[in-house]
Amino acid sequence: MNDTNGTFYAVGVGPGAPELLTLQAVNLLRQCPVIAAPQTRSGQMLALDIAQGALDLREKEILPLSFTMSREPALREESYQTAARQIEAFLQKGLDVAMVN
């Protein structure tokens, strides 16, 4: 068991061009061993694609997260809680997680 939890970082990828990521965003993505990213039903991970245009993430553990677009609040909350549990599992192992969005 790890006595120290990892840190969660939210990293915005900006308007869509990889060269517009901030230096701080790039540095955080370099330092974190786990990168979480929203994934569409078709499997697309647009925020991750943008980040990968700025730096090589092949050595990172990629955590795809699914969020429902349902109008039903309970279903949305369930998808948020599922994503939180997935991220928390890495944090409890002492691994830092950066979520791109």
Language-model features, listed with the residues they occupy:
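Class I S-adenosyl-L-methionine
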Residues: 1-18, 23-25, 30-101
